[in-house]
């Protein structure tokens, strides 16, 4: 989809299929709505007195208004004026884009990004608008026998009305938002695909497709079981052993720096993103309940977010180095699967007692985190649907953020704030490490019923002593259940904004 900008002082002269103007709660009109209301002899105030009160996300369409060139004026509810934020703006833009899709329109014009918001820039609002439009236009039909929207016209263009002085800032924000939205779309589709299609091999092939599409920016290596065993990744291999699907260890390298500016001795290393890629998690011998087991196809959303971030990176081509690592396999019960009480040796040399085979994400991540050392990274961020305990603690609003590095944690929190993809910093005190004590190995893979999200992060921290590290537990934010079941594309916005901030 194309995003563009236009500067005009005469909104009533804009020729478009649909023009969006904002209305705050209790019928308070935005400046754009005031202008259209004046040009149409009070058409907007006539409806705000009765049927449209500006509830956040609500829309009302006024057609063929006298004195207005736009075919439709779409009133978009903004909520209370004193509470209007970038998050509310994102919701308003998404509501407008959703209307354009539902009405089968190919283009529209929005005045919403021009509304001032405290502690935000035009770039922030433009980025939010493009991400919101991408979310509204995303549609999954990969596994339907007949794509249900094949014949419908597609939304091709949204134009933002802005001040001339803000053109460069707006265009930059729209470009960033469009790339992030494309990365989120890839992440969502990978998450939504069933486990019999999106296998470890499929993830490897998706990485290779990215490398072919962006061959000057992305290089990919896909390792098989024999190569992984040669590296000593005994913990990762032990999880994969229970399934007939072959494991894959995917290494992506992005370098947007000019050849003359490539890394020299002593320069900062790359940022490394590590994604958990359990393409289906039945729990292994410690099998999960059947009722919601279908949702365990989403256990690879950490890996999907790495791939989505790399897509967005390649589209924007910022001048930095990023490595992506994906440890992909299935976790199934079988005669060759891990058993409770088994002891395995990780790539780091530390031995692990497996007390619960359904705590497998940390078993694949620990070897990937050890592998990350070879890149001498400036920071390592792992992304994983790791614990149900994090869902209990934070629900579906905030991603759980664990790190002992204050600077890294603050940078990630700020990136989440900038993109309305929030995270919440959780404790990582050494006192929790005692729960992971084992009588038969260096460490146990679970720490009992208390503080499950924290002890999972504590487990991972044992393998991250060589570099600054943060862990994102996305178990509550990577997908939604219920009637709107589906992957969300988070935390691609947070990750991309963090990387863009590093390149700035």
Swiss-Prot record:
A Gene Ontology BP annotation from the UniProt entry: proteolysis
Disulphide-bridged cysteine pairs: none
Manner of cofactor binding, per the entry note: Binds 2 manganese ions per subunit.
GO molecular function term, any single one: manganese ion binding
Cross-referenced SUPFAM superfamilies: Macro domain-like (SSF52949), Zn-dependent exopeptidases (SSF53187)
Cited Pfam families: Peptidase_M17, Peptidase_M17_N
GO cellular component, one term: cytoplasm
Co-factor(s): Mn(2+)
Reaction catalysed by this enzyme: Release of an N-terminal amino acid, Xaa-|-Yaa-, in which Xaa is preferably Leu, but may be other amino acids including Pro although not Arg or Lys, and Yaa may be Pro. Amino acid amides and methyl esters are also readily hydrolyzed, but rates on arylamides are exceedingly low; Release of an N-terminal amino acid, preferentially leucine, but not glutamic or aspartic acids
Keyword match Protein transport: no
Subcellular location: Cytoplasm
Protein name per its UniProtKB record: Probable cytosol aminopeptidase
Keyword Cytoplasm belongs to the record: yes
Enzyme Commission number, as recorded: 3.4.11.1, 3.4.11.10
Species assigned in the record: Bordetella avium (strain 197N)
Entry keywords, A to Z: Aminopeptidase, Cytoplasm, Hydrolase, Manganese, Metal-binding, Protease
Family statement drawn from the similarity comment of this UniProt entry: Belongs to the peptidase M17 family.
Active-site residues from the entry: 288, 362
Protein purpose: Presumably involved in the processing and regular turnover of intracellular proteins. Catalyzes the removal of unsubstituted N-terminal amino acids from various peptides.
């Amino acid at each position: 989809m194309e995003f563009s900008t236009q500067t005009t002082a005469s909104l009533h002269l804009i020729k478009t299929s649909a023009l969006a103007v904002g209305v705050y709660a209790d019928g308070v009109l935005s400046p754009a709505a005031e202008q259209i209301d004046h040009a149409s002899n009070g058409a907007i105030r006539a409806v705000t007195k009765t049927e449209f009160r500006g509830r956040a996300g609500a829309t009302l369409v006024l057609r063929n208004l006298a004195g207005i060139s736009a075919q439709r004026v779409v009133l978009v509810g903004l909520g209370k004026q004193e509470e209007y934020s970038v998050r509310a703006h994102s919701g308003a833009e998404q509501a407008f884009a959703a209307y354009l899709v539902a009405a089968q329109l190919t283009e529209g014009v929005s005045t919403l990004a021009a509304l001032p918001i405290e502690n935000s820039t035009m770039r922030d609002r433009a980025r939010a608008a493009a991400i919101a439009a991408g979310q509204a236009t995303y549609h999954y039909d990969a596994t339907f026998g007949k794509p249900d929207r094949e014949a419908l016209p597609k939304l091709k263009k949204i134009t933002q009305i802005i001040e001339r002085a803000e053109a460069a800032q707006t265009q930059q924000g729209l470009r960033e938002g469009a790339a992030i939205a494309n990365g989120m779309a890839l992440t969502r589709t990978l998450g939504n695909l069933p486990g019999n299609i999106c296998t470890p091999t499929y993830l490897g092939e998706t990485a290779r497709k990215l490398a072919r599409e962006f061959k000057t920016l992305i290089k990919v290596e896909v390792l098989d079981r024999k190569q992984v065993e040669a590296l000593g990744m005994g913990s990762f291999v032990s999880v994969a052993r229970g399934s007939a699907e072959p494991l894959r260890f995917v290494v992506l390298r992005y370098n947007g720096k000019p050849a003359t500016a490539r890394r020299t001795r002593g320069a900062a290393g790359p940022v490394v993103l590590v994604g958990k890629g359990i393409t289906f998690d039945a729990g292994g011998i410690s099998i999960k309940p059947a009722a919601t087991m279908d949702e365990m196809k989403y256990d690879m959303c950490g890996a999907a977010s790495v791939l989505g971030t790399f897509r967005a990176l390649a589209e924007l081509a910022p001048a930095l180095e990023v490595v992506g690592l994906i440890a992909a396999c299935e976790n199934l019960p079988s005669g060759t699967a891990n058993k409770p009480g088994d002891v395995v040796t990780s790539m780091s040399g530390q031995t692990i007692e497996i007390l619960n085979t359904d705590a497998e994400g940390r078993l694949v991540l620990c070897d990937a985190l050890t592998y990350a050392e070879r890149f001498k990274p400036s920071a390592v961020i792992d992304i994983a649907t790791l614990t149900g305990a994090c869902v209990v603690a934070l629900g579906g609003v905030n991603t759980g953020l664990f790190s002992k590095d204050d600077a890294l944690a603050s940078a990630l929190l700020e990136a989440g704030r900038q993109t309305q993809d929030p995270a919440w910093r959780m404790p990582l005190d050494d006192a929790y490490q005692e729960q992971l004590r084992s009588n038969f190995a260096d460490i146990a893979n679970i720490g009992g019923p208390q503080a499950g999200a924290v002890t999972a992060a504590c487990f991972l921290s044992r393998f991250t002593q060589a570099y600054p590290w943060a862990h994102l537990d996305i178990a509550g934010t990577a997908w939604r259940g219920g009637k709107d079941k589906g992957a969300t594309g988070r935390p691609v916005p947070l990750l991309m904004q963090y990387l863009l901030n590093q390149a700035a």
